[in-house]
Amino acid sequence: AWYPGQAGGTAIANVLFGDYNPAGRLPVTFYKSTNQLPDFEDYSMKGRTYRYMTEAPLFPFGHGLSYTTFQYGNASLNTPEIKDGEQVTLTIPVSNTGKYDGEEVVQIYLRRPGDKEGPSHALRAFKRVAIAKGTTNQVTIPLSKENFEWFDTGTNTCLLYTSDAAD
């Protein structure tokens, strides 16, 4: 329940007794043990945070529970490229396959294929949507050019990562 505040007891009871269907997501990674963490004096990012983990954590960044279940369909883009000042729209069909109405937090993680030094993936966008039981919503998430930029240590700036069809 993290830091639930003065109404925390009531909120937790509502979840436990099924009066509220939770949809929150973890803002941090929970490691299985301290053995998964690098030495405290090692300032490398390897093995730290969800973006650099190489082992499976106990609960990853973005993990959450619900009293219902969701199934994702195949995502599609409205265009294969982004021009300056424009956006692409990612559309993902999300179905509520469970017994209860619920909310899902659709999370968009991007990675740079072949990158051995940078993060394995990074959260770039998300959208919380209410989906009635037995229905499918077409969730649309706009992505700008900045969503595809990565920090470059050589120039100390964010640069647009481009790839070819092989990536």
Walk through the language-model features, giving the residues of each.
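Conserved small/polar residues in nucleotide/adenosyl-binding loops
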Residues: Y161-D167
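Short intrinsically disordered coil segments
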Residues: Q87, Y109, L123-A125, N156-T157
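Short glycine/proline/serine/threonine-rich loop/turn segments at secondary-structure transition edges
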Residues: N147-L160
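Short, contiguous acidic/charged loop-to-helix segments that flank catalytic cores in large enzymes
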Residues: A1-P4, P80, F126-A132, N156
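Secreted, periplasmic, or luminal enzymes acting at the cell surface/secretory milieu
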Residues: A1-E103, Q107-L110
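Intrinsically disordered, low-complexity Pro/Gly/Ser/Thr-rich segments with frequent PxxP/GP/PP motifs
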Residues: G118-W150
